């Protein structure tokens, strides 16, 4: 416990909160170019081949981003937009690719939650 005099001399340090999406630098989304598109396996109780992409952002930072939805058209040099949002069973994946923008197509034959996957309204 510090004395009053010690607190006057040196004030208390505020506890700094760690940012969940540092690469976005306080922007809602960021544009980037895919440098590698691949699949990876999730953490222990789960089993799958999750589609992810390594993306170099316009601010020069390179991050791993998840490709949501079934099927995608991404390859190396595709221009994408990423948003925040981690994938719980993929360590190190803290970003999602936005479907239906730039070079990313929307999910085909999607009927529910269409706006989240960039799918047009079915006729």
UniProtKB/Swiss-Prot annotation:
Against Pfam families, the record matches this protein to: Ribosom_S12_S23 (PF00164)
InterPro entries, per database record: NA-bd_OB-fold, Ribosomal_uS12, Ribosomal_uS12_bac
Q: Name one GO molecular function term.
A: tRNA binding
Provide one Gene Ontology biological process annotation. Answer: translation
Keyword set, alphabetical order: Methylation, Ribonucleoprotein, Ribosomal protein, RNA-binding, rRNA-binding, tRNA-binding
This protein's GO CC annotations:
small ribosomal subunit
Q: Which residues does UniProt call coiled coil?
A: none
| Positions bearing 3-methylthioaspartic acid | 89
Its subunit composition reads:
Part of the 30S ribosomal subunit. Contacts proteins S8 and S17. May interact with IF1 in the 30S initiation complex.
NCBIfam families in the cross-refs: rpsL_bact (TIGR00981)
Q: What does this protein do?
A: With S4 and S5 plays an important role in translational accuracy.
Name the family.
Answer: Belongs to the universal ribosomal protein uS12 family.
Q: What is this protein called?
A: Small ribosomal subunit protein uS12
Tell me the lineage of the source organism.
Answer: Bacteria, Pseudomonadati, Thermodesulfobacteriota, Desulfovibrionia, Desulfovibrionales
